[in-house]
Design a protein with these regions (language model features):
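Short, cationic-aromatic polyanion-contact patches
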Residues: 314-329, 379-401
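Residue register of alpha-helical TPR repeats
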Residues: 5, 34, 41, 71, ...
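DNA-binding patch around the recognition helix
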Residues: 281, 288-323, 366-382
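Amphipathic alpha-helical segments of tetratricopeptide repeats
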Residues: 24, 31, 57-61, 94-105, ...
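Short boundary/linker motifs that mark transitions into or out of structured domains
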Residues: 186-251, 255, 297, 302-331
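Short amphipathic alpha-helical recognition elements used for nucleic-acid or partner binding
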Residues: 240-275, 295, 331-335, 341
Length: 405
């Protein structure tokens, strides 16, 4: 039986309950592989990823114990993910989970699969992330690990605009944490609960604008109304979704008609806004007729269409018409809400969906990265942006790191 100093055992228990500062105080000077691994995890939980990486790499270099080495490498995988390298981190997480499983460490293998799920979220593959988390939850898990997985479920649901599913997952996580209190997970739980309740957008309905939370966005996205989504530039009615991000003129026409609903919009006013001109002439009016015809064709299946009136056009719809707007009118707010879907975006893609120029999108993204509202990954043509979100693998708890005394 390997002797483990009491201080190291206490540090492992402190990390297991989310007390990183206490753990760091206990192993800050311990130079064994196990001590260095615990120190690295403590640094990571506190956000000092450089010191965390250094300690963990040192542990990998000096240990002869396969399980300690595998656990230190597992922690390094999550550091790679935290520093914006989701694609290589996903590959490393799969390999790490297999290694831990082979060494009989099913608990930390499950944690690595949750790291993999986090990587899939950052890569924009929400369905794959959901599948991985569901597989983890299908096993017989301890309450603390089940709490981590339930938090993962909640974040994926938030990014999928499924507020009800997110609330149910958070309730399961809270129930687990009632059995095994953990400061780190409790903070993640509160952060996600706050995200569910805060206003994230606005709705415009019959001239009335209201701030709405994720539950309200979920409600209007179910297809019971005709939703004209100015955040993602699409229209939803019934089971039909029409993407219009790359058809800016058609979306501009639909947006203006939806904004004026149930009234009509004058021809010259509609043309000026859709074509972004100050003075409308005969050629603009002719083009307007053509574009309205195209819009009518695109809207087939939505139970709504633009119809000519004496002085303009009106949107006739069998459902109430609701416009979904960003929380504010600035470009950063529009781009931020697009990032919330979990996908990784190029600046060009965000510009197209937000209806702004690429340079405007780049300025807004730079401001979001500086403020922590966005994460930038890749280089050159491969630069992508996503929302940071809650670390769904819980920043390397790696519970059960040392043998029981």
């Amino acid at each position: 039986v390997t002797f483990v100093p009491p201080g190291v055992l206490d540090a492992a228990r402190a990390l297991a309950s989310g007390e990183a500062l206490r753990a760091l105080g206990l192993v800050g000077r311990v130079e064994s592989a196990l001590g260095l691994t615990l120190r690295g995890i403590a640094y990571a939980q506190l956000g000092d990823l450089e010191q965390a990486r250094a300690a963990l790499e040192q542990a990998v270099g000096i240990t002869r114990d396969p399980r300690t080495r595998a656990r230190a490498r597992a922690a390094l995988v999550e550091i790679a993910l935290s520093t914006g390298e989701p694609a290589p981190a996903a590959r490393a997480a799969k390999a790490s989970a297999s290694d831990l499983e082979r060494l009989g460490d099913a608990r930390n293998a499950a944690m690595q699969r949750l790291v993999l799920a986090r990587a899939e979220v950052l890569l924009g593959r929400l369905s794959e992330a959901r599948r991985v988390v569901d597989e983890v939850l299908a096993a017989d898990l301890a309450p603390d690990l089940r709490a981590v997985a339930s938090l993962a479920q909640a974040e994926i649901a938030v990014r999928s605009v499924s507020a009800s599913a997110a609330r149910a997952a958070l309730a399961r996580a809270r129930s687990c944490l009632a059995e095994v209190p953990n400061q780190l997970l409790a903070r993640a739980l509160v952060a996600l609960e706050q995200e569910l309740s805060r206003p994230i957008a606005r709705t415009l309905r019959k001239g009335i604008i209201r701030d709405v939370d994720l539950f309200a966005v979920e409600e209007v996205s179910r297809g019971e109304v005709l939703l004209v989504d100015a955040c993602r530039r699409l229209a939803i009615g019934g089971r039909v979704t029409i993407p219009l991000a790359k058809r800016s003129v058609l979306f501009a026409l639909l947006f203006e008609l939806a904004r004026g609903w149930p009234g009509s919009v004058a021809r010259d006013e509609l043309a000026a806004r859709a074509f972004d001109v100050r003075k409308v002439n005969a050629s603009h009016r002719s083009r307007l007729r053509v574009e309205i015809g195209r819009l009518r064709k695109v809207m087939d299946g939505l139970a709504a269409e633009p119809v000519a009136t004496a002085d303009g056009y009106v949107l006739e719809s069998k459902r109430d018409v609701v416009v979904l707007l960003p929380p504010t009118d600035d470009e950063a707010a529009r781009i931020s809400i697009l990032l919330g879907d979990g996908a990784t975006w190029s600046a060009q893609g965000l510009a197209e969906h937000a209806g702004v120029s690429k340079s405007t999108a780049q300025r807004a993204l730079a401001a979001l990265v500086r403020s922590g509202g966005a994460v930038r990954t890749g280089k050159g043509k491969d630069v992508r942006y996503t929302r940071p979100g809650t670390p769904i693998a819980s920043r390397m708890l790696l519970l059960g790191l040392v043998p029981k005394p």
